[in-house]
Amino acid sequence: MLTRLVLSAHLSSTTSPPWTHAAISWELDNVLMPSPRIWPQVTPTGRSASVRSEGNTSSLWNFSAGQDVHAIVTRTCESVLSSAVYTHGCGCVRSATNITCQSSGQQRQAARQEEENSICKAHDSREGRLGYPLSAHQPGSGGPN
């Protein structure tokens, strides 16, 4: 069973090309889930896009500037596929000279890194199943929006 959680992020860009090279990173809002740097899979949905892994912290997206991005993020916790609840996305528009983040929110990532060693055990013992608190970004029993 795989719980699918969808987060919308909005990219804005002042660059002239219609398509921008952007890196999306996420901030967790569920203490049972690990920090973004060990979430290897980010899947764009509902849009025409290309995505590839960029280390373990983010994925590179090719989207039209100003376009809404919908993502499903999953990882394997030992033998269990799990998903995280996200409340914040930072869209970084890469240009030839700089990277401009439209929003911030990565301050809590460092604090969560020390939780990673016990994150699977905490998930198994406290949740006991693939169930997560509802948030504004978690769809109902249906598919992604």
UniProtKB/Swiss-Prot annotation:
**Primary location:** secreted
Record-annotated membrane-spanning stretches: none
What is the superkingdom listed in this entry's lineage?
Eukaryota
Concerning InterPro entries, the annotation shows: DUF5570
Record's subcellular location: Secreted
Q: Which residues does UniProt assign to the signal peptide?
A: 1-22
Q: Which GO terms describe its cellular component?
A: extracellular region
Keyword list (alphabetical) reads:
Glycoprotein, Secreted, Signal
Which residues does the record list as glycosylated? 98
Where are the residues of the annotated region Disordered? 103-145
Q: What is this protein called?
A: Uncharacterized protein KCNJ5-AS1
The primary gene name is: KCNJ5-AS1
